[in-house]
């Protein structure tokens, strides 16, 4: 099918999800708060005062829900079904928009490689490691340490001579 059809299906699914969210919000906050707006007309329209009004209305609505014993009321089944159906439609459309997935089976890529090159990563080869020192015979170790010390002192002397000039 055409990609625009799947994009349209995703759009319809997202619109249905937004509608379900709006319906759920209306279910939990059913009244418009006109009574409280009339009582609070002395409040001018500023962002801080709007926040105060919303918090007062929320407390009023919660206490009303407690008095009518509707506090633990769940969402109606039509809102729940609309949410689930919209989610399924959106996911179905997204899967078709994504296109064909690549196979996870790597045999096609490994056909032209030999066993020697299969796990061969030359960039991980390390030639300068402690194995040279650890597995060297002990008599050569002492002489090499003395050679290293003498070369270090001669190097230091050369540096000092260049500084004196």
Curated annotation (Swiss-Prot):
Residues 23-77 are lumenal. It is found in: Endoplasmic reticulum membrane; Golgi apparatus membrane; Early endosome membrane. Keywords: Endoplasmic reticulum, Endosome, Golgi apparatus, Magnesium, Membrane, Phosphoprotein, Transmembrane, Transmembrane helix, Transport. One of its GO terms (molecular function) is inorganic cation transmembrane transporter activity. Residues 1-3, 98-165 are cytoplasmic. It is a multi-pass membrane protein. GO terms for cellular component: early endosome; early endosome membrane; EMC complex; endoplasmic reticulum membrane; Golgi apparatus; Golgi membrane; membrane; plasma membrane. Coiled coil: none annotated. Belongs to the membrane magnesium transporter (TC 1.A.67) family. This is ER membrane protein complex subunit 5. It comes from Bos taurus (Bovine). The gene is MMGT1.
């Amino acid at each position: 099918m055409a990609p625009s059809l799947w994009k349209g299906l995703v759009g319809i699914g997202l619109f249905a999800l937004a509608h379900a969210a709006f319906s759920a919000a209306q279910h939990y906050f059913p009244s418009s708060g006109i009574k409280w707006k009339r009582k609070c007309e002395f409040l001018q329209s500023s962002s801080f005062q709007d926040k105060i009004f919303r918090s007062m209305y929320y407390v009023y609505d919660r206490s009303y829900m407690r008095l009518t014993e509707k506090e633990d009321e769940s969402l109606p089944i039509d809102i729940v079904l609309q949410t689930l159906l919209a989610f399924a439609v959106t996911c179905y459309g997204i899967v078709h928009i994504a296109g064909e997935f690549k196979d996870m089976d790597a045999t096609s890529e490994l056909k032209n490689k030999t066993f020697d090159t299969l796990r061969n990563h030359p960039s991980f080869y390390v030639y300068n490691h402690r194995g040279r020192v650890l597995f060297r015979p002990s008599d050569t170790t002492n002489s090499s340490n003395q050679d290293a010390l003498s070369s270090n002192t001669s190097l230091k002397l050369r540096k000092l001579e260049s500084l004196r000039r």
